[in-house]
Curated annotation (Swiss-Prot):
ATP binds at residues 11, 59, 87, 93, 104, 114. It is found in: Cytoplasm. The keyword Phosphoprotein applies. GO terms for biological process: CTP biosynthetic process; GTP biosynthetic process; UTP biosynthetic process. This is Nucleoside diphosphate kinase. GO terms for cellular component: cytoplasm. It comes from the Bacteria. The gene is ndk. Keywords: ATP-binding, Cytoplasm, Kinase, Magnesium, Metal-binding, Nucleotide metabolism, Nucleotide-binding, Phosphoprotein, Transferase.
Length: 141
């Protein structure tokens, strides 16, 4: 098995409710190493750029506004099967249908305010990591 990296966002709703520590703890309890992490406040340009694939969809503008509404915490996580395991840990986008014990089931408020984002492929993880981090901000552990 190869060690993989994935990208995580602790979103505005979770940051506002002081859930950063609880969510980071879940990452570590599930075998992820946090090899980079920082709090950022997205500009409109950053939010639109990050979600560019959704431009033109009806939820794009509200999503951009939501992601700009308060700081977020972006992280790079590492472990074997990181992308798949992280997606399992966070649960489905809609917290109502997420499995018990997942981050979204436990913390999300709604489908939009779903507390976390996770890369859906290794390719997207690499792109998303590079969007927020330089190589010198990522530390092997």
């Amino acid at each position: 098995m190869m060690t993989e990296r994935t990208f995580s966002i602790i979103k505005s709703d979770a940051v506002k409710r002081n859930l950063i520590g609880a969510i980071l703890t879940r990452f570590e309890q599930n075998g992820f190493k946090i090899i980079a992490s920082k709090m950022v406040r997205l500009t409109r340009e950053q939010a639109e750029g990050f979600y560019a694939e959704h431009q033109g969809k009806e939820f794009f503008a509200p999503l951009v506004e939501y992601m700009m509404s308060s700081p977020i915490v972006v992280s790079v996580l590492e472990k074997e099967n990181a992308v798949k395991d992280y997606r399992t840990l966070i649960g489905t986008t809609n917290p109502e249908t997420a499995e018990e014990g997942t981050i979204r089931k436990d913390f999300a408020l709604s489908q939009r305010e779903n507390s976390v984002h996770g890369s859906d492929s290794i390719e997207n993880a690499n792109r998303e990591i590079a969007y927020f981090f330089t190589d010198c901000e990522i530390f092997e552990r």
